[in-house]
Design a protein with these regions (language model features):
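Intrinsically disordered, low-complexity terminal regions
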Residues: 1-304
Length: 304
């Protein structure tokens, strides 16, 4: 399995794989604390990937990425985890890898053996990273919380099992957790947020926003909203609350399996009026707003 894998491997890539794998240098295998720093050009990309462990990212100064990882070996061995640092063009990739079984590139982590030995993967890892302002960031942990507070140009952040918290991003945000809360605050670009099992809370300066949860509440606040992009909010089991500017306009489609739908805005109803199903127009219409929940109330509120 590859974290953040997005490209199909082709025969030509496979033919050169042995040379690439053998060239990867795993560092810090026997060290309790590992540090690395790399310069990244303006607008460059920073990628931090880990099978497990908490990742805390903040804004640094200058044009250097500063990475520090601390191993807690009370329930495991120091040599379970090592690190691969790869500089490529105007970007850098840093991976925390299971030293005998992982490979690392710009798209993420990949296991060599295709098998997983859960019994000895018990070492806990805590990573802190300082990144230059304005970089593009991609980061993921297979099992751990991920926190980002930095004025990066855009961010793609995920956890397989942990909380995701993001604040201050100046552009697009893509945030997800397989099992944990997702919180995005003070974002000034489009936001896409997902949780398989947890609440999703978003506060943006400008929007638009799309959010979903398999089992959790969705709370979204947009102080401003430019453009006419469609938005969708859905929960399998939870309340959905969307706060929008007072000049908001949209074609609304809302459905609740078991709950009421309310709005602060005058709305022109289309079709049959129902407490759990709503079709109508707010303001001048335009963008499409879709909302749904299997079990919970839905609210469209006016920002104050």
């Amino acid at each position: 399995m590859r974290l953040f894998a997005s490209h199909t491997l082709v025969a030509a890539a496979l033919a050169t794989a042995p040379a690439l794998l053998s060239a990867q240098q795993v560092q810090g295998v026997k060290e309790r604390v590992f540090s690395a720093s790399e310069r990244v050009g303006s607008g460059g990309e920073v990628r931090i990937y880990a099978r497990q462990g908490d990742i805390t990212i903040s804004e640094g100064t200058g044009s250097t990425v500063e990475f520090r990882a601390e191993k807690d070996d009370r329930r495991g061995r120091l040599d379970e985890i090592g690190f691969i640092v790869r500089k490529d063009g105007d970007g850098v990739t840093i991976c925390a890898v299971y030293a005998d079984d992982d490979d690392c590139d710009a798209d993420g982590l990949e296991r060599r053996s295709g098998r997983w030995n859960w019994g000895r993967r018990s070492l806990h890892l805590a990573m802190t990273v300082k990144v230059p302002r304005g970089v593009h960031l991609r980061t993921s942990s297979g099992n751990g919380d991920v926190s980002l507070v930095a004025g990066v140009a855009e961010a793609r952040v995920s956890s397989g099992n942990g909380k995701v918290r993001i604040s201050g991003v100046n552009g697009r945000v893509d945030a997800s957790s397989g099992n944990g809360e997702v919180t995005v605050d003070n974002a000034s670009g489009p936001v896409q947020a997902r949780s398989g099992n947890g609440d999703v809370t978003i506060g943006t300066v400008n929007g638009p926003v799309n959010a979903s949860s398999g089992n959790g509440d969705i709370r979204v606040r947009m102080d401003k909203l430019s453009g006419s992009d469609d938005m969708e909010f859905s929960s399998g089991n939870g309340r959905v609350e969307v706060v929008v500017p007072s000049d908001f306009s949209a074609e609304v489609e809302a459905n609740s399996g078991n709950g009421r739908i309310t709005t602060d805005f005058p709305i022109t109803i289309r079709g049959k009026l129902s407490p759990s199903r709503l079709r109508g127009t707010i303001g001048n219409g335009g963008r499409r707003l879709r909302m749904s929940t299997g079990n919970g109330s839905m609210e469209i509120r006016r920002a104050t």
